From Swiss-Prot:
Gene3D superfamilies tied to this protein: NAD(P)-binding Rossmann-like Domain, Ubiquitin-like modifier-activating enzyme ATG7 C-terminal domain, Ubiquitin-like modifier-activating enzyme ATG7 N-terminal domain
Function per UniProt: E1-like activating enzyme involved in the 2 ubiquitin-like systems required for cytoplasm to vacuole transport (Cvt) and autophagy. Activates atg12 for its conjugation with atg5 and atg8 for its conjugation with phosphatidylethanolamine. Both systems are needed for the atg8 association to Cvt vesicles and autophagosomes membranes. Autophagy is essential for maintenance of amino acid levels and protein synthesis under nitrogen starvation.
UniProt keyword terms in alphabetical order: Autophagy, Cytoplasm, Membrane, Nucleus, Protein transport, Transport, Ubl conjugation pathway
Pfam family, one: ATG7_N
The protein's name: Ubiquitin-like modifier-activating enzyme atg7
Active site: C521 (glycyl thioester intermediate)
Domain notes: The GxGxxG motif is important for the function, possibly through binding with ATP.
Topology of this chain in the membrane: Peripheral membrane protein
GO biological process: autophagosome assembly; cellular response to nitrogen starvation; macroautophagy; mitophagy; piecemeal microautophagy of the nucleus; protein modification by small protein conjugation; protein transport
Amino acid sequence: MFVGKALQFQSFHSSIDATFWHQLSNYKVEKQKLDASPLTIHGKFNTYSRGNISIVFGEAPSNSNIKDCLAEGTLLNANTPQEFTNADVKKIREEIGEVLLNSIKNGVVSERPNELLRFLIFSYADIKAYKYHYWCLFPSFKETPHWIVKDLSPAESLIPSGPILSQIREFLSTADYYQRPFFLLIKSTLDEWTIAPLKELSHCVDKSLQFYLVAEDSVQLAEYPSWPVRNILAFAFIKFKLKVINLFLYRDGINSDTLSKSILIKVEADKDMILEAPLSIVGWERNGKGVLGPRVVNLSTVLDPFVLSESASTLNLSLMRWRLVPQLDLDRIQNSKCLLLGAGTLGCGVARNLLSWGVRHVTFVDYSTVSYSNPVRQSLFTFEDCKRKLPKAECAAQRLKEIYPNMFSTGYNISIPMLGHPIYEAGIEKTMHDYETLENLISTHDAIFLLTDTRESRWLPTVISTAMDKLLINSALGFDSWLVMRHGSVLQKENRLGCYFCNDIFAPSNSLVDRTLDQTCTVTRSGCANIATAIAVELFVSLLQHPNGHAAPVLNEDQTVLGELPHQIRGFLHNFSLMKISGMAYPQCSACSECIINEWNREKWMFVLRAINEPDYVEELCGLREVQALGEIAGTMEEWISDKESVIL
């Protein structure tokens, strides 16, 4: 600044950290979606920030630090890169210029001086690539006259710093945040200086009082005032027709005991200011190359990989709610704790599908180790796992965490007690421990997936899950067929859906006795497991969208935002067909009937031990023995009638 020369101003430099872009990304994905409405942001600076303004997402806080000046801003975020590239930036400038001019003319600035700091950011967020394109506009009028410096002096040379500093501190401590950037220093008739809000300017002009326009001035170079000073001069010129203005550039800060950095300037306009539509607005920030144009920030190289993994893994799910399924309850899915009984072909497939739906808590139960035949069919295992003979459950859990580090996954290497597999004295303690672990796991999880190799291994989990009224999804494979079904809920009462065993008139027994190799291994067409596991998880997710969860009835109509909720889905690859079947719970079912559940509730482990070691106990308890007897009588009668008819003929 030199006397006789035109006053020049230092542009603001935006300072935007990764937090801002992370908040924008979350807001865009979760709330704003396709809406392109302007968003509220704010900036803050002080006398120590050296011309930098920190941009913050959201509204300006009313209880901000008294050292800071707050600028209110608008964020326009384009939905596509084409919208950003082809935008009419001239129109954007004119619109914000109109807002600024109207605020000056209608008196808003007098009441809220920080309106002179209003700014805009035009952006495009490439959320998938973590790249953010943006252009900041700190608007001012191009038609502003040249302000010629008539006088220049240190503040301390004309104003007593002691009394003034205490008044400034008191004003900044008590004034609302929107009054802090600009205020008045008025000289009274008694030659005393007092601090007053900007709205007193009209009184000063009417009474011809001596005053200074005070601006909190954040600069990098002491020779030039900051960009907001340009707007306070324009305000005084437009609103009050002032052509000669005394400026007090306050640069010392509220903690300073002196005014050694502050400057007093007297300026005069060299011409009238003509404002005609369309307004010419300046103030676009220059990019890193020093030219007018957008900046680009790439956060993929600086963000924590765990943060990147978290946001990227849920992005596709969140995008479903933009257009396709706005009511999709992702939180209910992601917060579900899932227990997978079986870590084989079905278990691996279900786990990967749960992971893709955002489930973050998966527990495996399996008693076998990874064999050389597994990796080609079971997606969570590798050749190295076979060589080391790792337990399947623990290995699968570890592999999930390698795929997604924020996953909470554990594996339990336990055996499920099974009907038809007697427990001998030496194995009672181990089997009881496994049983207690299984019971505890079922009680602490929200959803159970039955994915074991044999029918008898599904019996005990069915009993416990029914007694605890857990959501249970059952999936089983044949050679070219598969089954996915949900078990009913006790809340369905007389309309309770059946379980896996409700169509059987015999309790499950040892299915591995007297079987050849092709009957003891899972021999199935390769695609069956992939289809079955996908549908099992989709049924689980759909159930969570119904207010009644797994107690939802079966209706031939869309029951949730994701569609129908069948009871059973059976698929056949030989003719590529699907069947949806419904069946009610069987009163004499060996797994879910009332008498079985009541007995388990009473005896717990002792019931299980007796059921396993006494072959006929379960059938007698649930009434299947009587059903079988009636069937034998009916069969005998049918044979007798058939013999009689043949005699007559």
